[in-house]
Structures are given as C-alpha cells and as structure tokens.
Design a protein with these regions (language model features):
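Sec-dependent N-terminal signal peptides of Gram-positive bacterial secreted proteins and lipoproteins
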Residues: 2-25
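Cellulosome-associated attachment modules in secreted, modular CAZymes
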Residues: 18, 22-25, 497-565
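Low-complexity, acidic Ser/Thr/Pro-rich repeat tracts that form intrinsically disordered stalk/linker regions
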Residues: 24-53, 565
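Predominantly the structural core of cysteine protease catalytic domains
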Residues: 29, 47, 54-66, 83-91, ...
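A short glycine/serine-rich beta->alpha loop
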Residues: 68-78, 126-130, 505-507, 539-541
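Alpha-helical support elements that line or immediately flank enzyme active sites
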Residues: 77-100
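PGST-rich, cysteine-poor low-complexity/disordered linker and tail segments that act as flexible spacers
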Residues: 433-500
Length: 565
C-alpha cells in the first residue's frame, strides 16, 4: 500500500524530550535533504492560520505575570512533553476565562492522555509505549476534540500504571474542547494575538544543550544535526529581551541573533532554573514554531459539559491527515459521516469538523440515511443546517438551529467549496500512518462510516465509484489506491437531550433564580441565550422563550403549581 505519494522525507516528528537524556532522539537528522533523513508518513502539517491583526499589540505580554498559569509540571523520565505542552495551554485558557483556578487542583492528567495514546486491544490507535513512546501533538488534539478528556490529575495521577487505564470509564470532565486553531508559523503577529486572546500557544522547538546560552535563554541559529523535538506552551513575549542574552557557542563558532526579542515558554521540567521553570527562546530560533514537529496550535473554544451533551463520532483519534486527494478533480465536494443516535429526544445543535481549507465556503447538511445506512444521493432531501466560511485551519464547531433527530442513523455532511479561494479542498481524516520501519498509527475506520458526494462523475473509469453521486470513502481508498485500511472523516455531531435540564437557561447545571433573570433579560434583548440555553429556557415547551417561562421557573423554585395559587 502506498500513501498517495504523501510519504515524504522529513525529520522525525516525534516529541520525546524528558528531564534526563536531553540529547537522545528517535531521529538524528538535519533538514529534508539530510542523508540521515528517514521516509516517514508523518501527520500532515496543513496550512496554518494567518489572523488579521487590527490592533496594536503590546511590546510584551505574560500570562505568567498575570497568574493565568497552573504550577509548573515535572515530566521526569516520561517522554510526554507533547501532553504537558497541550494540556497546560488549555488550563491557561480556562483560567483566563475564570472557569478554573490556577492551583494544582486544576491540573489535567498528562498520564491519562498518554495512556489514551497507546494501542487499543484490537490494535487500533497510536502505536507507541506508555511513558516512553514519544508522541505527536495530534494525540492531544484528538484526545480533547473527541471529549476523551481532559481528566483531572487527581483522578488519574502521574504515577498511574497503564493497567489502570480503562477506555470505557466515565470521568467527570467538566469542560470539553470545541475549537483548535493551527497557526501560521511564520507570522509573528498571528502568534502574539493568539497568545493574548487565548493565553497560550502550544508549539515545539529543537532541544539541545549547545543551543542554551544558559538555563533561561535558548537559541538554535540554523538547521541542526541534533533534531530533538520538545513540546512547550508559549505564554508570552518581550520585544526588548536583549539579543546578547542568546549568544551561544556551537563547536567553536559563536552565534548571536540579529535582533532583540523572545518568546516566554513554559517548560515541563519542574523548577529546574531560577525562573520558576520558564525560559526565553529567541524570535530567531530556527525551529520554534516550525512545522517539522507538526502544527503549532491554540485552543479557541470549549463548552461546559453536562449529562445532556453527547458527541457523536465515527472516529475518536482526530485528524492524522487531510483528505485533499480530490482537490484537483473537484473544487466543490461534500464529505459525509453517518452517525448513530442512541437515545430519543436528542436535538442536534452543533457540528464539529476539521479542515485546513481556510476561507473556503462551507455548508452543513442533515442527510437522511436509508435502511442500509447509506446517505441519500438526492440532494433535494437534504436539510441545510448552516452556511459560512471556514474561519481558520483546525477543528471548528458551528452552532446550528436545534434539530430533532430520531434514534438511529443520520448523515451529517460538510460541503467545502474552494472555487473562489486558493485553499486546497479537504477535510480531516483519521488515516493510518507508517514510516519505512514501523507503523505509527492504525485507523479504526470501517465501511459505512464516511462517504463522498460530488455533483459530477470524477471517477469515470472506476465502475464502483461512478454508479452514484454518493460513494463510501473506503471504496475510494481500495479502488483508487489498493488500500483496504483507509480512514474516516473528522465530522462530529453534538446533541442536547431536551428536558434533562429544563429551565437551565445559563447552562450552569442547576435551575435557579439566575436562569429566570437570564430569560427575562433575553426578552428585552439585553442577554443572548445560546442554542442550548434557548431549548432549556422554553420550559413550558410552547416554542417561544418569553415571560411565561420566567413564571414557570419561579413556580418550579417555589415548588407550587398554578393551581395552588
């Protein structure tokens, strides 16, 4: 099986640096032309997002100084920097928004995401060892976007053995991720604005002792023969940090950046220096924000989780590639997932998908499914849920008007139209990965999960793909490329069970006088209810949110009925 010519020669993207053995790496390669390069099917890098920065950014910023960070972590010998780098950025966003405090009680468990990122009993998943298998940033993003975490450190401590991990165990996950943005590694203002808006950005650099001017200043001046990927959370910057602070001597040659300025980085080695475990890395470092180790990313959105919310998905590992194989054949393609709705009284109110087609037009559809589980090819039977533009590269969740969905199978389609853009047409796909020596990731994809819809026949010479406008993506993989493993699309439906928390207009998990106030304010347009809040607010279920619902909540709280008054 080949990989659509997408197996590339590149430095290993594994992120493995622990407190000890800082010069040890799974790959000791230089650039893409290095004779030591290996052919490795690394996860895609995709197009990062460049933001329109219409504000004057300050010369310095620090989430650390603003106390928007949890206590520093200590990864010890465990090669899980990729877990700490991602989780700590999410912690900072939640602290910034006042959702959690900045104590160690708010730590997310790196051990849990590490265990989650090991092979399942059926052989699917990431093919790596617990604690010492290195990792990719995609593991953390897949873990959080599938709502498998974050799990509290108190529930799954650092010292937990792998035997304690149970994929089916239900944890108390209070907040779930709904947005992750990949960043343009070359646009400094985009990165600064993301740090300022979201508190932190997760990225990676080349950790090697010769690149350290001291234990608080790091600078790699150019392509290195000592690639040793290390993941960190960048929580600030300072344009005036002296370039002289980063002078390094490498094999007898002295290097100093040309300009002042540096990024403030949160490490995961405990309080190993006199800067509380933080350090500065020069703006001119060769590998900081490089896509050699995968995309740099920021968490943009999340939602409060409760028993009423359910995420419906055919994959749980997230995007390992971008399905952009049809770009040259079709600039307007609909990608479809068939999802199982297990309960009654479910209302679809959000759709999450992963795409790097920044700026492309998208249309979300509800698509009927026949008795065999195949989405309808008759587009007149589809219901448009929402239209818009792909706002950034990464995982995006769109709110849709609540739609009742029956128990059983439903189709959710994401049409991507890149006709008027330079973007490549694609959708995230959970697809198998390997390098020349070993398998990296095994997909859980099966037939009947993901489909492709095109208005024109782009497979005229492939009978199995030319009979219908709707084709199982597994047929594409097998018939076009002799690949029987394939992958499935990253398209998820989020539902809300109506009536479970009737009256909970502000979605704080309880029904109290604050909900009545929120509803009353919404009637005079001084408060905007979310789509979930509108469902809950309509406590008398008359199809409208008004003062009658306020009265019903007041009666509920007083535990009296209208007949008793």
């Amino acid at each position: 099986m080949n990989k659509f010519a997408k197996i590339v020669s590149i430095a290993s993207a594994m992120l493995i640096v622990s407190t000890t053995g800082l010069s040890v790496s799974a790959a000791k390669v230089d650039t893409l032309e290095s004779k030591n390069s290996s052919e490795i099917a690394i996860p895609f890098t995709g197009e990062g997002t460049t933001l329109d920065v219409d504000e004057n950014l300050p010369s310095s910023y620090s989430s650390k100084d603003l106390n928007l960070v949890t206590p520093i972590r200590q990864q010890g010998n465990a090669q899980i920097c990729w877990a700490y780098g991602g989780l700590s950025s999410l912690e900072t966003l939640l602290i910034k928004d006042g959702v959690i405090d900045n104590s160690s009680n708010s730590w997310y468990s790196a051990a849990h995401v590490d265990a989650w990122g090991t092979p399942r009993k059926d052989g699917t998943g990431w093919q790596r060892e617990y604690y010492k298998g290195g990792g990719f940033p995609y593991i953390t993003m897949g873990y959080l976007s599938s709502w498998s975490g974050g799990v509290s450190e108190n529930e799954f401590p650092y010292t937990s053995p792998l035997s304690l991990f149970d994929i089916n165990k239900k944890y108390n996950i209070n907040n779930v991720v709904t947005g992750i943005m990949y960043l343009d590694s070359e646009d400094k203002d985009t990165i600064k604005k993301s740090i300022k808006d979201y508190g932190a950005v997760t990225t990676h650099y080349d950790e090697y002792s010769k690149f350290s001017a001291d234990d608080t200043h790091s600078y790699c001046p150019g392509a290195s023969n000592y690639i040793n990927g290390h993941c960190i959370s960048v929580v600030g910057w300072d344009d005036n940090i002296s370039k002289e602070s980063f002078t390094v001597n490498i094999d007898g040659t002295t290097y100093t950046p040309k300009k002042d300025g540096a990024w403030l980085c949160r490490n995961s080695w405990g309080n190993y220096n006199d800067f509380d475990g933080y350090f500065w890395i020069s703006y001119e470092d060769y590998y900081i924000f490089s896509d050699v180790f995968g995309p740099s990313y920021a968490f943009t959105d999340y939602m409060k989780n409760n028993v009423s919310n359910t995420i419906h998905q055919v994959e749980t590992f997230g995007a390992t590639y971008e399905f952009d194989y049809l770009d040259e054949a079709s600039k307007d393609t609909t990608y479809i997932n068939v999802l199982n709705i297990d309960n009654t009284n479910e209302y679809l109110n959000k759709v999450m998908f992963e795409s790097t087609s920044v700026g492309a037009n998208y249309t979300l559809y509800y698509i009927p499914v026949d008795n065999e589980g195949t989405p309808s090819s008759d587009k007149t039977t589809w219901k448009t849920l929402k239209t818009g533009k792909v706002p950034y590269s990464g995982y995006y969740t769109a709110d849709v008007d609540p739609l009742y969905v029956s128990k059983g199978k439903i189709g959710i389609g994401v049409e991507i139209d890149t006709t008027d853009t330079k973007a490549i047409n694609g959708i995230g796909v959970s697809e198998w990965l390997e390098n020349k020596d070993e398998r990296i990731f095994n997909t859980e994809a099966k037939r009947g999960q993901s489909y492709i819809y095109t208005d024109k026949n782009i497979f005229p010479n492939i009978p199995s793909l030319s009979k219908s406008k709707v084709n199982d993506v597994m047929d594409f993989y097998e018939d076009v490329n002799d690949d029987t493993e394939g992958g499935n699309f990253v398209i998820k439906g989020i539902t809300y069970k109506r009536g479970t928390l009737a009256g909970d207009a502000n979605l704080d998990g309880v029904v109290d006088i604050e909900d009545a106030v929120c509803i009353q304010k919404s009637t005079i347009h001084s408060y905007t209810l979310s789509s979930e809040g509108q469902i809950n607010a309509d406590i008398n279920q008359d199809g409208a949110v008004n003062i009658k619902d306020v009265t019903e909540i007041q009666r509920l709280l007083a535990k009296v009925t209208g007949d008793n008054q």
